């Protein structure tokens, strides 16, 4: 109940009208009150809504795959707005500027496309993200390699729009179908992960008590983020609560920092853990389960129903924001409660 009280309080504080947008990458393309993607899209020429949707997919997919935790020492100075941002917001704006520059495109005449990913280099990412010894970014090589594998696997992310649109029935597309397409098409990009019968399992881990635990945090974060460009293209996305909560360190950190979850061994707070360690897998799986538990409690406090306030709004308003706030109150730099070794593709 205490955690639900805290989340409801943060939602009312940030969104007094309770008009909370979906938890999506698009929230991170804002700076100094400006919607940078909207500005970019308004200036461009689109022959039809599908063309704009493909470009939005190009931006969103690449940006989400670059969105794993930056580490506490990185920041991004955006020249056009003069804003300096860190973590997800910084990564979001940096990735938008990288996309805008045409670095992902095969032709300078059409910069707002991502069809040159297979040849993307870490040095390009380092320059665009202002990485230096004084401004280090966690997992730089891993991020660039992930984009290259994305390009090798699917060519252009924008083409996923057409795949998803083709799965709509009478203009209606269930949100789990978005995730299904992503898991099918992006499977090959996840390296050094569990493989069963030749199939890469992605963000799936073995746990001694739970067996195989599928989490797919980045893929689900991407699925949530693709809802809006699909809607803008005229599709009706339904069953949004068919996606799960996100097992990342803001939501998971909320439950540790608020005392909902307690470490069996207090010394684990000072140790560094691998992503596949049973402690981390258990923490992430409990995070998904607890998000399902806390959502109705938050709605009850806000006096709203699930149909108007789906989990995507609870996350945004919400558990993610409260987790970040608690982290900032408890730790210098606002990092997660557990120290986790990241290659830039999970957290």
Task: Give the residues covered by each predicted segment.
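Extended, well-ordered protein cores
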Residues: 1-235, 239-267, 271, 278-347
């Amino acid at each position: 109940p205490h955690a639900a009280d805290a989340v409801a309080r943060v939602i009312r504080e940030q969104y007094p009208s309770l008009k909370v947008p979906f938890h999506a990458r698009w929230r991170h393309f804002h700076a100094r009150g400006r919607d940078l993607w909207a500005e970019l899209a308004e200036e461009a020429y689109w022959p039809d809504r599908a063309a704009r949707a493909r470009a939005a997919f190009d931006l969103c997919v690449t940006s989400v795959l670059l969105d794993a935790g930056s580490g506490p020492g990185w920041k991004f100075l955006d020249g056009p707005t003069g804003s300096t941002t860190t973590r997800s917001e910084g990564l979001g704006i940096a990735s938008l500027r990288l996309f805008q520059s045409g670095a992902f495109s095969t032709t300078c005449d059409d910069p707002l496309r991502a069809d040159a990913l297979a040849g993307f280099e870490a040095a390009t990412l380092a320059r665009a993200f202002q990485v230096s010894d004084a401004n280090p970014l966690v997992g730089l090589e891993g991020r660039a390699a992930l984009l290259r594998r994305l390009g090798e696997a699917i060519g252009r992310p924008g083409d996923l729009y057409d795949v998803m649109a083709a799965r709509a029935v009478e203009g209606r597309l269930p949100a789990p179908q978005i995730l299904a397409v992503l898991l099918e098409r992006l499977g090959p990009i996840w390296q050094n992960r569990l493989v069963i019968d030749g199939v890469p399992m992605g963000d799936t881990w073995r746990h001694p008590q739970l067996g195989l635990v599928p989490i797919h945090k980045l893929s689900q974060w991407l699925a949530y983020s693709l809802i809006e460009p699909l809607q803008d293209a005229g599709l009706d996305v339904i069953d949004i609560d068919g996606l799960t909560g996100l097992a990342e360190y803001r939501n998971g950190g909320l439950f540790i920092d608020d005392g909902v979850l307690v470490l069996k061994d207090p010394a684990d707070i000072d140790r560094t853990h691998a992503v596949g360690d049973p402690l981390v897998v258990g923490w992430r799986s409990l995070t998904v389960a607890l998000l399902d538990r806390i959502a109705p409690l938050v709605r009850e406090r806000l006096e709203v129903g699930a149909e108007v306030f789906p989990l995507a709004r609870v996350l945004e308003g919400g558990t993610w924001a409260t987790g970040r706030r608690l982290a900032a109150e408890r730790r210098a730099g606002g990092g997660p409660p557990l120290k986790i070794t990241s290659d830039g593709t999970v957290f």
